[in-house]
């Protein structure tokens, strides 16, 4: 389960940022997680609650925005939603699809005090 290492990395990053800003408490964290990122959102939520215990982020609210995956056909330029890394263009039936979004895993914002 790599979600625990992700949760711990997020906690480390946001608590370090809070420390740099002279704050001692993280009260909220907002993440963006793409559907093709390989992250199980429910597992990440579970791991987050365990990872933040006894840290400045203990009790912080976690908000996760799930980002749809979008591909662009390199043959015809069509942009369309995708559900896997291997997608076929709905317009020209080519498999030359570049993933435009959906692999994200990032901290959008933190709330500190």
Swiss-Prot record:
Zn(2+) binds at residues 73, 76, 89, 92. Ni(2+) binds at residue 2. GO terms for molecular function: nickel cation binding; zinc ion binding. InterPro entries: Hydgase_Ni_incorp_HypA/HybF_CS, HypA/HybF. The keyword Metal-binding applies. Keywords: Metal-binding, Nickel, Zinc. Transmembrane segments: none annotated. Coiled coil: none annotated. Pfam families: HypA. GO terms for biological process: protein maturation; protein modification process. HAMAP family: HypA_HybF. Involved in the maturation of [NiFe] hydrogenases. Required for nickel insertion into the metal center of the hydrogenase. NCBIfam families: hypA (TIGR00100). Belongs to the HypA/HybF family. This is Hydrogenase maturation factor HypA. It comes from Chlorobaculum parvum (strain DSM 263 / NCIMB 8327) (Chlorobium vibrioforme subsp. thiosulfatophilum). The gene is hypA.
């Amino acid at each position: 389960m790599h979600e625990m290492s992700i949760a711990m990395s997020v906690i480390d990053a946001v608590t370090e940022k809070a420390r740099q800003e002279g704050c001692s408490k993280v009260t909220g964290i907002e993440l963006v997680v793409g559907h093709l990122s390989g992250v199980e959102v429910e597992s990440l939520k579970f791991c987050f609650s365990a990872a933040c215990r006894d840290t400045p982020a203990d009790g912080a609210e976690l908000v996760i925005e799930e980002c749809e995956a979008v591909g662009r056909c390199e043959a015809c330029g069509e942009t369309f939603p995708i559900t896997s890394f291997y997608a076929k263009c709905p317009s020209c039936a080519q498999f030359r699809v570049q993933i435009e979004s959906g692999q994200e895993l990032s901290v959008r914002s933190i709330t500190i005090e």
